[in-house]
Amino acid sequence: VTSVRLVTFNIHHGVGDDRRHDLARIAGVLAAADPDVVCLQEVDRTFGPRSEGVDQAELLARALDRELVWASAIEEPRRDGPAKRYGNALLTRLPVANDAAHRLPGHGEPRAAVRADLVVAGGALTVVATHLSSDSARSRAAQAEALVGLLPPPGRAAVVAGDLNCGASATELTPLRGRLDDGWSRAGARRDQARRWQVWKRDLGLTHPARRPRLRIDLVWVSPEVRVTGAAVLDGSRCSDHHPLQVDLDV
């Protein structure tokens, strides 16, 4: 059995509720959690002024000393420099056996997923990190179906993680529920944000908006081969508009 700590975090291109871009705050939250695998959404790579033109994926991979696997949702070439990229980053300290970037179907803002087969004791753990459509349940349904197509055959350990822009019981996630279980519900122990104004909402896994969370849309789905020993909503309020979700897994 390999114990794996995974964190999924929509980092809002490093801009916090004070409207400041400060990637060091993101790195600090992640370093404190010390995850084996990090699934990041809304990551800029030399995108533009909103994130000071930096390669956020590379900087975070270096800061955390993790291997980077990437999938662009938006990629625009430039004549005078590196391409303008925005999408999903997977950072891992576990060895990567295979990885691939996948475009997802749907209308509106382009969406993507990154898939990595990670080496664990006695086999592999497939992790798919993604960010689904924010404005169309129909698009999310098509994207969920596509995610199922990225999973390994039944009987092999798999995780899907990211900002799915809908709750775990949403109709459009029916394809996922056919193969995977909601990790928060499966967790042996759960810890929510313990702010005083949120006392009546503890144990709900609310992650968005960070200032006063009312939605559980940052989700981790696990196959039956994966045991969820714990789950916690971390505090991302100073560095993003989402809180990170941490899950501890036995694979």
Can you name each region flagged by the protein language model?
Residues 38-43:
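Acidic beta-strand-to-loop metal/phosphate-binding motif
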